[in-house]
Amino acid sequence: MCKLLDQTSPDTAPHKPYVAFRYANPLTEDTYKQLLADGFGGGNGGRAVAFTQYPQYSCSTTGSSLNELWKWRTRLEGKRGTGEVEAKGAINWSVIDRWPAHPGLVDAFAELIEKKLLEYPAERRSNVVLLFSAHSLPMSVVNRGDPYPAEVAATVYAVMQRLGMKYKYRLVWQSQVGPQPWLGAQTSDTVKNLMKKGQTDMCLIPIAFTSDHIETLYELDKEVIGEDAQGHEGVKRVDSLNGSPTFIKALADLAKSHLHSGEACSPQMILRCPGCTSERCLAQKEFFARQSGQDKQEAAAA
């Protein structure tokens, strides 16, 4: 992506990629320290973009990751690290916080779906049910006002429009754990129930994941297709985005647009969930709101 971005946005080049995870290495703390070691921030200034790889925003995913970023920014460059709320020469952060209906993302999903549909005999193709599967959320989070269900639905609808609304489809939810209520219908239940009704041609699309991992390779491939569908040849999974050239171009386009926008984040990022009581979430959003204000002042001055 950065190689492509260097070509399409030479005025902001060179672009250097870093990876940070919440629960695997390299952790956000380690990546932030690496940025400082590489000469970013720590009195040297410089710009960094936190580019979430969750297309659809949720407080449980992107929000949690940004809370972690804000925490380490505060500890390493903020008041706890320097004694100043806005230390001079700190990294100037901005964030690409959501992109559920970006045309490049939609095209990438549609291309992979069309490719998988070609594996069905022509006479069966129009009867394939598309099951868009996303990680579920507890209803307690949804009822707090989390935008995730609406943003996942926006992706699904945009992809179906790109496909000409030619196929039957449903949005289903996977990875529920524990006894509390979660978003439904569950992916596994849906596959089993449709098969009981005689619908055996189904195509699973991991619509909220951008790469393969345990929830695609194990949960969808082994548990849902291998066990719930008993390996029926009509139940297939669309490949994940992974290294799709269309997807990589979409990432570069998103980064370029963001770098030239002068915005620190989307307007939606600043809005808290109506039922949110997290002080860390509030502080994180206030931080990015300040960054956004600084960006606008600098743009106006220029």
Q: Which sequence ranges carry the predicted segments?
A:
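Extended amphipathic ligand-handling, pore-lining, and cofactor/metal-binding catalytic surfaces
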Residues: 1-302
